[in-house]
Amino acid sequence: MIVLSFCGLGFAQNVIEPELQNALNQKGDEMISVNIILKSQMDSEKLRACAEKTTDKHVRRNIMIDELKLFSEKEQQEIMSILHAEAKSNRVADIKGHWMANYINCTTTRDVIYLLAQHPDVMMIGYNQEKYLLWDEKAEPVEMSRDIVIENVTMVNADDVWAMGYTGDGVLVAVIDTGVNYNHVDVADHLWDGGPQFPHHGYNIIDNTNDPMDVLGHGTHCAGTICGDGTSGIITGMAPDATLMCIRVLDDYGYGYASDFNTGMEFAVEHQADIISMSLGLMSASVSDKTLLRNACVNTLQLGVVAAVAVGNDGQMAMVPVPNNVRVPGSCPPPWLHPDQEVNPGALSCVVAVGAIDYYENMYENGSKGPVTWTDTPFNDYPYNPNIGLIRPDICAPGVGIKSLDHDNNDGYNLKTGTSMATPCVAGVMAL
């Protein structure tokens, strides 16, 4: 039996996020999915030092991943013991430890949550809530002549780079999204080879299967902007010879969990992706979601990976004003600080936040706007005052009226608009 003192319960309430406490009040004894974030995080300098003697980037990354896994396994040991003991009484299920951000995701009861909140290793416990993580970027049919390079490719001069011999060949880009129609002929011949374990060129995190097929269309459209090679007649990709890894973290309707973002990033990094593209994000994210995703983005950068991430299409939404208008993880810091940011510096992460422009270089009116702040989190940096905070976005790319791959037609195309469409443009340019 779990016994809580009144003193302990008071302490627990400081660790349990308000969103989770509200859910506990409503759900009573019902099991609930939570993220248990530990206080300890791997020191970045120590992480880099463990692999400083090797120059091979893959060997270096594998050494650092092993260190992160050892660190998290050790730090999570006591909490894991409690969880597995409670699982024998059916009070805990679906236990999963994460090494990228040192937290544990599980489904458990209110009493176990209160018990864990008193443990000295626990920083916070958050509600791992399913949320809609896309925007209403409607697909429109497109009829156009074949044997062309589309406008957004030429607008950023990607075709000029191809003429210099750079087409993305040898660069592995992971699309973390609704999955990808890997049968589309414009990407089918340059997909990641996952061997017999991952025969469909990636992973489906949301369903825990090895088939990341896209049934919604968002991820396929994004993938085409990265590396659609024009086999069916229209070159849509910035880097037409880049290799594509397909990671599905959203369900058939665009819903998902912050914990699955992290799992998708872990998969991409562990399987040697060079670049990540994420055209999704959490609106009004909780402190726990912001914390675990920023921790993941910090370590992703340490492991030598950068990510193009959409800022969102919430620029006209009064319910999420600046400095909370940019979605997470698009609000995470960049890999490099712009000189204009030096008046208000902070720590770095892997995120290159992407906004959208039209073909006349006008800002997309619905694009989310910065600056943002992290003073409401354990990071406590980038304090916000008007026109200060953390500058978001970092860069803008064509995102209005973008033609790319249709998930319902293996040789078809369609048109979409939004920062989701601008983000893979940046990821593709990174690959070049």
Label every PLM stretch briefly:
Residues Q13, L24, G28-D29, D160-H201, ...:
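Subtilisin-like serine protease catalytic core
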Residues Q13-E137:
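Inhibitory N-terminal propeptides of secreted protease zymogens
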Residues I36-Q41, T108-T109, Y127-E130, A174-G179, ...:
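Active-site-proximal beta-strand/loop segments in catalytic clefts of secreted hydrolases
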Residues L115-L172, V185-D186, E361-E365, G370:
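Protease zymogen maturation seam
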Residues Q197, R327-A431:
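Extracellular S/T/G-rich loop segment that most often corresponds to the catalytic His/Ser-adjacent loop
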Residues M265-S288, A310-V311:
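Short acidic, glycine-rich surface-loop motifs adjacent to enzyme active sites
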Residues D289-G304:
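Catalytic-core regions built around general acid/base machinery
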